Regions:
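Conserved loop->alpha-helix
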Residues: 1-119
Length: 119
């Protein structure tokens, strides 16, 4: 579960086609070991759920970047399939018991995409 409140903004640094989808790598000064700005993201671990532009993804690799595998269905149902290197994405870690809830309960499980036709 997430709150929907953005915690970090990261730049897409790599997009690769993999079996069944795409590998997405993002860099963030907030998680870079060279930036000195680690807390509260210093304890990230593989398998952790991270919201990337509102989509719940499992972290598969950490370091000075974060890596996620995005399956084909998620690419079709979300805007992640439109990403290009250099784009910025919003990140949020999943809630832990006892965390303050400053937003709303958000699962990050996407059903479909919509199109704005008028403003």
């Amino acid at each position: 579960m997430f709150t929907g409140i953005i915690e970090r903004v990261s730049k897409v640094v790599e997009l690769n086609t993999v079996a069944g989808g795409m590998r997405l790598k993002v860099f963030s000064e907030a998680v870079s070991s060279t930036s000195g700005i680690l807390a509260p993201w210093q304890d990230l671990s593989t398998g952790e759920s991270i919201s990337v532009d509102g989509v719940c993804l499992s972290l598969i690799e950490t370091g000075d970047f974060l890596a996620f595998d995005v399956i084909e269905e998620s690419l079709r149902r979300t805007s992640l399939g439109d990403l290009q290197c250099g784009d910025l994405v919003n990140l949020e870690r999943s809630l832990k018991i006892g965390d303050r809830l400053g937003g709303h309960y958000v699962t990050g499980h996407i059903d479909t995409r919509g199109r704005i036709t008028a403003q």
